[in-house]
Amino acid sequence: MVPDLNTPGRDSPRHEWFGEQIQYRAKLRRFSKAPPEITVQQVSFERDFQRYRNAYDRGQTSCFNRPRTGRPATDAPRSDESLERSQRRAKTGVRLLVTELAPTALVTFTTRETMPLDDLLKVWQRFCALMRQAGIDFEYVAVPERHPTNPSHFHLHVAYRGRTKFDNMRRFWHMALEARHGRRVFIVLRGVESPGNVDVQRIKSRCAISAIRKIARYISKYITKDMISEFNRKRYWPSKGITLIEAERFWLSGLTQLEAIKEACQMFGLWHEGVDFCPQKIWMPGERFAYIVVDPSLLPPAPF
């Protein structure tokens, strides 16, 4: 699936703004181990003009430079709009990182003891150090979840990529939990002695792509507004080395959402010309955005 990069003018609007104040742009997000995602976005000159006008009224030299008022105090109240923006950014960040990771398993780490989130993070860091010391190479994206009946209790949902015996993970998890109290253990503790559990759901290769996307959506839903409001910091912990490929953007000629979607599908080789239809799943939450998640099994046949 190769975009039509040779078409001139795709890096700038296809129509003059004074003639067409509503235009569309396609964003291509590639992943190294999963099919890409495509967003068709409406761009409004009127909204942009209002942004420039507001910046001018505030005496700013650019509409992209917000006045800096210093770092807000961690206990400073935040508006609902600010919390919702933070939540959306964090959810999107988690979903993209998990998709790029292409995990081989979804692992849930639980603790018998109730502990603050800071302590849980230290236990997790200790667990990761033990895994590295044992020569186990792995990558992850971890998101804490507040227990539904005990808000002070947390456990971790982890998108995991690597090869290891999961009994080793349980042993290292118990070692990290017990080390918090200065106790040294070298085996998996059972029954009432167990300080926590590790639940593993492996991803089957025959449905890997759909499972990866499902895990990405599942983990990102635990980025909640109350967690953002309470902790006011990063709400997920990715391992080093997970790098997102920079998104590519292409301006479209279509002047309606349906025209723009068809043009984007044709540009990226998703349109089935024989039946004049795109078999890919397209989600349109409103007139400003449309999302296309590519399923390779639904690509149109080669034209030869």
Model-assigned labels for residue ranges:
Residues 1-152, 161-304:
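Right-hand nucleic-acid polymerase module
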Residues 156-158:
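Long, low-complexity, serine/threonine/proline-rich intrinsically disordered regulatory regions
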